[in-house]
Swiss-Prot record:
It catalyses: 4 Fe(2+) + O2 + 6 H2O = 4 iron(III) oxide-hydroxide + 12 H(+). Keywords: Cytoplasm, Iron, Iron storage, Metal-binding, Oxidoreductase. It is found in: Cytoplasm. Its EC number is 1.16.3.2. Homooligomer of 24 subunits that assemble into a spherical protein shell (12 +/- 1 nM diameter) that can sequester at least 2000 iron atoms. The keyword DNA damage does not apply. It is an enzyme of class 1 (oxidoreductase). Residues 1-145 form the Ferritin-like diiron domain. This is Bacterial non-heme ferritin. The lineage of its organism: Bacteria, Pseudomonadati, Campylobacterota, Epsilonproteobacteria, Campylobacterales. GO terms for molecular function: ferric iron binding; ferrous iron binding; ferroxidase activity.
Length: 167
């Protein structure tokens, strides 16, 4: 049986994952409207992935006979200065989500909630992967530059990542 504390934290995490999905959808739209179709595709796909993260949490809560408490999702940022800023914000956002997951893991350990701890290990691994991914993209964008041809090359690099993640 899940403790009230874990239930509260998991419900909050569902909403954080939904917010993540909206943020990446907003970033994707900005990229598409600035002819950065590669980054747009990557972020669009990533928005769907974040939505799947929320669904996975919902299923876990439902399996434990816990009602999910969805809250209003605030409007995500939609004005950006450029590709570097988008991926910097995305990287920082992933770090924030990792902190949130780690906090729930800590509570599960303290409460000796082995089932929740085990369930969350997938998220711990996923967050590590996402932080590495976004940091790598950010590093490549900064290396290539985002002026003139560099912006095009950076967009193509991100497009390649998006396509490779689909296969």
């Amino acid at each position: 049986m899940l403790s009230k504390d874990i239930i509260k934290l998991l419900n909050e995490q569902v909403n954080k994952e939904m917010n993540s999905s909206n943020l990446y959808m907003s970033m994707s739209s900005w990229c598409y409207t600035h002819s950065l179709d590669g980054a747009g595709l990557f972020l669009f796909d990533h928005a769907a992935e974040e939505y799947e993260h929320a669904k996975k949490l919902i299923v876990f809560l439902n399996e434990n006979n816990v009602p999910v408490q969805l809250t209003s999702i605030s409007a995500p940022e939609h004005k950006f200065e450029g590709l570097t800023q988008i991926f910097q914000k995305a990287y920082e956002h992933e770090q924030h989500i990792s902190e949130s997951i780690n906090n729930i893991v800590d509570h599960a350990i303290k409460g000796k909630d082995h089932a929740t701890f085990n369930f969350l290990q997938w998220y711990v691994s996923e967050q590590h992967e996402e932080e590495v991914l976004f940091k790598d993209i950010l590093d490549k964008i900064e290396l290539i530059g985002n002026e003139n041809h560099g912006l095009y090359l950076a967009d193509q690099y991100v497009k390649g990542i998006a396509k490779s993640r689909k296969s």
